[in-house]
Amino acid sequence: MRTVETLRIAVIGAGLLAAAPAFAFDGSKTTDAVASPVAVPLAPAPLSPTEAFRFGTQSLKNGDKVKAVHSLEYAAENGHFLAQWKLGRMYAEGEVVAHDDLKAFEYFRRIADSHADDNPDTPQARFVANAFVALGNYYLSGIANTDIKADPDRAREMFSYAASYFRDPDAQYYLARLYLDGTGAPHDPRQAARWFGLSAQKGQCQAQAMLGAMLFAGDHVPRQAARGLMWLALAKDSAPSDQQGWINNLYESAMRQATEDERALAGVYLKHWLETRKE
């Protein structure tokens, strides 16, 4: 019995030794008995709105439209207003995405709601002002088959805010048109001329053309033919292709009617304008 018991204890001891970690003769563990750690991949950290915006704009440059839109939407949903503005422009113009004025309107409205009080002297203020201008134009005409109906009074509020607070030249031009046409505002050509003037000084070609035509003809303002020709010439030289037709017509009509002295004086005014802008 003692022999059997001794054997049983020896077997159990051998089993325990086999299950225990192996040690070298110096007491250190041998490597072949140590389990290798399992590498568990970590989930990538989510992009910040700014990182997503940058990735989206870079994807646009690379031609990857799907990644671009997804990244911009992620940034926009997380409050990145430049992503909201970019998507608004894309939907308004049908660039990369299908044209959708209602989606564009919603993006622009989010910017206006959140950034109306931004400092007007910061570089990004022009994007906020542009959102107000876009909203003004949507309210002016409405969006077909949606709840956004034509509301000239609301359009004037949008243009007026961007024109006054942000001093935006496009807003000033559109506000002037409302006063000139009596749409959403009292018919007030003198007020229109004032806003055209503020916009024209900033280089807005449509305002330059309208102001030039009013001054040349003496339409509700004292006639200044040479000054009017100067503004028309500036407008003609800077007009984008989609505005060249009517601006060129105004310029050519005024040039046909102008006297030699008026043309000569307009040239003097134009030279002075260009020289002062270089300084």
Residue spans for each PLM region:
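Canonical positions in the second alpha-helix
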Residues: 41, 74-75, 111, 161-162, ...
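Terminal, low-structured helical/coil segments at or just beyond the last alpha-helical repeat
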Residues: 31, 242-279
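N-terminal leader/linker segments that initiate helical-solenoid repeat arrays
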Residues: 19-66, 70, 78, 84
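TPR/TPR-like (Sel1-like) alpha-helical repeat modules
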Residues: 105-114, 222-242, 268-274
